[in-house]
């Protein structure tokens, strides 16, 4: 190719792919299928940066290869467009989120198409489209019908800036995941999804999917299943029970105090018995100003207040013990109260030291004057457990003791909490519930879905955190579908995670208005064969979507229990300064700028070549230029290709390259796949020629990475059809074996020389040749050979000593 005009070439092939529908999946159930999935983008006003390109390029390469291998490939794209950023922009500018969202989607679509992604654009969906969120609401109502949706007053994570409730997942580190403001605790009426009822199913499902170990571990840790015991402590001189959960019931004899969450309802119930209630109330007010993150930090001063006049009784020994309140105990975790064993829990030990509370050791080991002993050992000071030195046995004995006396039982707890599922904002799916003074909470009838967002002029939430929808009387006021009485609509909306919890199902049948997807199509396409996405979503979106899917499986709406057969991750593209790209740092690289200067194929190739796909790496302009030169050299191969068949000198390298690129793509080792093609190109240039058949092979290998150039070269070769749908090259394993290999020679453990031998050389011959090497003789002349060993393909090992 005399002139590699990437601008003309790339537009030409993008237009042809679109015109011919090259990448459309077809619902032909007789074909082998491959469903490749990426995390769909949130269409922000800033547009995409090159990090987005990397996020989509890994699965892009895999899907292009699968298509060339004869699979019916579904590789779709969507836009996760509900959420606070668009609404905050609307509040600031007065521009409706619908207008902003449509503009941003148009911008993102253009960027994606200019890169040349092989998406099936006929299946694009948008979570803000009523045809889509109708089914989001339908799934919500199915959960409501099956008791997985409930409303409760609770202390929740609340962002004063966004004026909305946040889930634990959206407020990690005590910061709002949306605006990064500090989160506070606030008592509000909250919609919850009972995700905890699916905790065991979510854990069990991990055994049946191909997820990396670190992703499985993060999900397991987030769910946080523990086994232990529920134990009932009575409040002195009352019939009241203070119920706690512990993973170490064997240490009950070491309990010397209890701690309740400042919000615990028993405090108010027995306020008349608590003589220092003023001090308690003051402390409770201070706790209310702290985030959950601040309250649960391990490394902080221990604060609290003793409840004077209120004590508990240790059920295993009858001892009266004090009760404190402290910020590190949360009402939403466990039972809102804990038993404290300061001898064997460091946080309890710190608290006991701060408040002068007794410390009773019940497990031998350590020096409890200096710190808590958290290891195993022989039980002491524990009545019937004394002398037992097996933790499991001690726990079983105590569980039996508790059960016999009716003061406790074996139990299971989870760190994961039920999912706070509402926002007091406008730009989200309306929650399809009606509040009737007679019937209570009533579902919007299915035939009235979608419940559409009304037009509003003011997007500001109310000062008390009410949704903007609460201001619209025509939306709020309605009739109860059960009894016909005047009623009120729910005015909260769903969180952004709602639409992304099932989008992979809608891709399968995006235009169906009778159901979210046809059962036969679901049976054919599910599960997703390979899902690639960011590591930041493995404890939020990935858990949420698995939960929704498993629920749909349980009610017979989908054919498989797990949505994703395989999941993989990727590293970030950092700025040239080595820091994560962000607009505020000014280190964002716009893919459009790279495409204008170097071309989409260069961008695609560099993104895949810059580092191991799973690693984060800085953007380097020099690397981009290097990939541009590589593609220019590839383009020039057209000028030297002639004839058919194989070139003897290239036979080995061509087969090796096909083998390596094929395997590296499967392993997501895209950088080494490209490196192998670069090595092959160097050998071709050293030989000075190649056949058209060999060029055809090379082009097909490169096509998933640089498809525009490869399509142009394919056409110039006179090949039929498109390179993107041509057959993936095969290789001959026998041709992948080197005729000659280089091996090392060690003398007394140190490498003294290297030499080339036939790959199939016999051991005796290899050893004999090694002994004749001049550099080896320097260390063996006059010496006695004690050991002679040939490790095939690697080395000759000689051990000598003076004669």
Where are these regions (language model features)?
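Secondary-structure transition/capping motifs at alpha-helix termini
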Residues: 64-72, 92-98, 114-118, 145-151, ...
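N-terminal catalytic cores of NTP/NDP-binding nucleotidyl/phosphoryl-transfer enzymes
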Residues: 26-97, 124-139, 246-247, 314-351, ...
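NTP-handling and nucleic-acid-processing catalytic cores
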Residues: 2-14, 50, 136-364, 466-468, ...
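Helix-rich, typically C-terminal accessory recognition domains appended to large enzymatic cores
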Residues: 80, 145-157, 161, 251, ...
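Conserved oxyanion/phosphate-binding beta-strand-loop segments in alpha/beta enzyme cores
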Residues: 1-37, 67-76, 100-107, 283-325, ...
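Residue patterns forming the tRNA-binding/recognition surfaces of aminoacyl-tRNA synthetases
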Residues: 12, 16-20, 92-242, 247-249, ...
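Long, His/Glu/Asp-enriched segments that create or flank divalent metal/ion-associated functional microenvironments
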Residues: 443-480, 485-489, 495, 744-748
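Long, charged, mostly alpha-helical binding arms that flank functional sites
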Residues: 4, 225-230, 364-367, 372-400, ...
């Amino acid at each position: 190719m005399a002139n590699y005009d990437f601008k003309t070439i790339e537009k030409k092939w993008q237009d042809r792919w679109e015109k011919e529908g090259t990448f459309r999946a077809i619902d032909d159930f007789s074909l082998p299928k491959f469903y490749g999935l990426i995390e769909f983008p949130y269409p922000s006003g800033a547009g995409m940066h090159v990090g987005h390109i990397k996020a989509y390029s890994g699965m892009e390469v895999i899907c292009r290869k699968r298509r060339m291998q004869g699979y019916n490939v579904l590789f779709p794209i969507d836009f996760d467009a509900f959420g606070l950023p668009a609404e905050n922009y609307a509040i600031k500018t007065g521009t409706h989120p619908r207008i902003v969202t449509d503009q941003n989607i148009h911008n993102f679509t253009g960027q994606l198409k200019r890169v040349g992604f092989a998406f099936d654009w006929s299946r694009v969906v948008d979570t803000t489209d009523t045809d889509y969120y109708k089914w989001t609401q339908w799934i919500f109502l199915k959960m409501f019908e099956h008791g997985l949706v409930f409303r409760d007053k609770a202390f929740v994570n609340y962002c004063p800036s966004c004026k909305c409730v946040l889930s634990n997942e959206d407020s990690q580190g005590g910061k709002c995941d949306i605006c990064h403001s500090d989160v506070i605790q606030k008592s509000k009426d909250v919609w919850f999804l009972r995700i905890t009822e699916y905790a065991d199913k979510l854990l069990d499902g991990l055994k049946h999917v191909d997820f990396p170990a670190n992703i499985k571990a993060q999900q397991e840790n987030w769910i946080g299943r523990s086994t232990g015991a529920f134990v009932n402590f009575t409040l002195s001189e009352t019939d009241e029970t203070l119920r706690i959960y512990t993973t170490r019931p064997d240490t009950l004899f070491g309990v010397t105090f209890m701690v309740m969450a400042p919000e615990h309802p028993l405090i108010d119930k027995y306020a008349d018995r608590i003589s220092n209630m003023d001090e308690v109330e003051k402390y409770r007010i201070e706790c209310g100003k702290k985030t959950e993150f601040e309250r649960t930090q391990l490394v902080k001063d221990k604060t609290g207040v003793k409840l004077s006049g209120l004590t508990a009784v240790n059920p295993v020994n009858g001892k009266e013990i004090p009760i404190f309140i402290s910020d590190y105990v949360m009402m939403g975790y466990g039972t809102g109260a804990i038993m404290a064993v300061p001898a064997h829990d460091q946080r309890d030990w710190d608290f006991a030291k701060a408040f002068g509370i007794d410390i009773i050791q019940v497990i031998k080991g350590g020096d409890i004057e200096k710190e808590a002993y958290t290891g195993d050992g022989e039980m002491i000071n524990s009545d019937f457990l004394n002398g037992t030195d097996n933790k499991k046995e001690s726990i079983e004995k105590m569980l039996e003791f508790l059960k016999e006396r009716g003061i406790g039982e074996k139990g299971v707890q989870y760190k994961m909490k039920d999912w706070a599922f509402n926002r007091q904002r406008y730009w989200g799916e309306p929650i399809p519930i009606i509040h009737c003074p007679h019937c209570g909470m009533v579902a919007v009838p299915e035939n009235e879905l979608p419940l559409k967002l009304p037009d509003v002029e003011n997007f500001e939430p109310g000062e008390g955190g009410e949704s903007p929808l609460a201001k619209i009387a025509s939306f709020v006021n309605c009739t109860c579908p059960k009894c016909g009485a005047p009623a009120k609509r729910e005015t909260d909306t769903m969180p952004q995670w709602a639409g992304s919890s099932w989008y992979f199902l809608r891709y399968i049948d995006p235009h169906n208005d009778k159901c979210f997807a046809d059962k036969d199509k679901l049976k054919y396409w599910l599960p997703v064969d390979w899902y690639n996405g960011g590591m930041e979503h493995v404890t939020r979106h990935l858990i949420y979507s698995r939960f929704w899917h498993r629920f749909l499986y349980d009610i017979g709406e989908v054919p498989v229990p797990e949505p994703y057969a395989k999941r993989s991750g990727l590293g970030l593209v950092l700025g040239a300064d080595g820091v994560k790209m962000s607009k505020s740092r000014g280190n964002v690289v716009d893919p459009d700028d790279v495409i204008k200067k170097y071309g989409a194929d260069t961008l695609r190739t560099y993104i895949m070549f810059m580092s191991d796909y799973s690693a984060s790496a800085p953007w380097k302009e020099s690397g981009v230029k290097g990939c541009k030169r590589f593609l220019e050299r590839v383009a020039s191969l057209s000028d030297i290709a002639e004839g058919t068949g194989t070139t003897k000198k290239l036979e080995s390298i061509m087969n090796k390259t096909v083998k390596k690129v094929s395997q590296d793509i499967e392993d997501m080792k895209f950088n080494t796949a490209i490196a192998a093609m670069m090595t092959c190109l160097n050998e071709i240039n050293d030989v000075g020629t190649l056949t058209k058949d060999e060029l055809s092979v090379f082009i097909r290998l490169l096509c998933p990475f640089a498809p525009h150039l490869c399509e142009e070269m394919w056409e110039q070769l006179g090949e039929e059809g498109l390179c993107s749908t041509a057959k993936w090259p095969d290789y001959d394993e026998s041709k992948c074996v080197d005729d000659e290999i280089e091996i090392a020679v060690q003398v007394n453990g140190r490498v003294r020389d290297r030499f080339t031998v036939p790959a199939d050389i016999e051991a005796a011959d290899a050893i004999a040749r090694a002994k004749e090497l001049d550099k080896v003789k320097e260390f063996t002349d006059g010496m006695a050979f004690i050991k002679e060993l040939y490790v095939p393909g690697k080395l000759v090992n000689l051990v000598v000593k003076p004669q």
